[in-house]
Structure formats: C-alpha cells, structure tokens
Amino acid sequence: MASTRTTIIKLIVPAGKATPTPPIGPALGARGLKSIDFCKEFNARTAGWMPNTPVPCKITVTPQRTFTFTIHTPPTSWLISKTLDLEKGSSSPLHDIKGQLSLKHIYEIAKLKSTDPSLQGIELLSLCKSVIGTAKSMGVKVVP
C-alpha cells in the first residue's frame, strides 16, 4: 500500500561516491524509488567537491514516488578535523588539547556553513560561536 504522505530521508553520503548499495539502496528502495536515479544526480551535483567529503542530504519522497533532495555543508567537526589534519577529536577535551585553531579559520568555516540552506538567516557571529563550541568539544584550542 502506497503512502499518502511525503517522507523525508536524511543520509550522509561521501561526495561523488553514491552507489545503490547500503545504506542508500535499502533506504530508497523501501519507499519505491530507484536508487540509481538518486545516485546519478547526487554524484553529478557533488562532482566538484573534494572526494570522500561527507555530504549530508535531505531527500523528500512524494506519494507519487518522485523525489527531490537538498545538499548541505559537511559537518563542522569534519571541517575542523580537515583543517587541523586530525583523525578524531579528544576523548577528554579540557585536558587533552589536539590542536589550535585561529579565529580566521573559525570565520572561514562559519562563512562556509552560512551557505547551508538550513542555516539561512542566522548571523555569522552566531555561526562563529557554534564553530568555537564544536572546536572546544573536540579538544581544539581557539587562539586569536
């Protein structure tokens, strides 16, 4: 029996590496969609991105078995990790400092995050504070 409501699926897919294997295939196939169509369009949209960048996307599935999707910016923690070339954050953030991040880096990450469709209308200062909070929770010291 077909659903009469729209469904939203949230996935994190590596840029340019979408394939109809799990987790994409089962998530879309259970809702009656051809996952290969999504994969082709997703890979085309993320072709210019750095390979293996985790790209969050929100897929909206209509009752007619059609879909639209929006691509969001990579997670803040991933951006910080790539900036500092870290494998992962600190397990005890206040005691084990993994690296230092300048305010210029914070500003650039916040500027990138401001292009995200879900963050439209949020002030850049608020985004900078959010990035600083994420950095501190990862054991990264913010220096001027």
UniProtKB/Swiss-Prot annotation:
It comes from the Eukaryota. SMART domains: RL11. It is found in: Mitochondrion; Cytoplasm. The keyword Cytoplasm applies. The keyword Mitochondrion applies. Transmembrane segments: none annotated. Residues 1-32 form a transit peptide. Keywords: Cytoplasm, Mitochondrion, Ribonucleoprotein, Ribosomal protein, Transit peptide. GO terms for cellular component: cytoplasm; mitochondrial large ribosomal subunit. Its main location: mitochondrion. Coiled coil: none annotated. One of its GO terms (biological process) is translation. One of its GO terms (molecular function) is large ribosomal subunit rRNA binding. Belongs to the universal ribosomal protein uL11 family. Component of the mitochondrial large ribosomal subunit (mt-LSU). Mature yeast 74S mitochondrial ribosomes consist of a small (37S) and a large (54S) subunit. The 37S small subunit contains a 15S ribosomal RNA (15S mt-rRNA) and at least 32 different proteins. The 54S large subunit contains a 21S rRNA (21S mt-rRNA) and at least 45 different proteins. NCBIfam families: L11_bact. Component of the mitochondrial ribosome (mitoribosome), a dedicated translation machinery responsible for the synthesis of mitochondrial genome-encoded proteins, including at least some of the essential transmembrane subunits of the mitochondrial respiratory chain. The mitoribosomes are attached to the mitochondrial inner membrane and translation products are cotranslationally integrated into the membrane. This is Large ribosomal subunit protein uL11m. It comes from Schizosaccharomyces pombe (strain 972 / ATCC 24843) (Fission yeast). The gene is mrpl19.
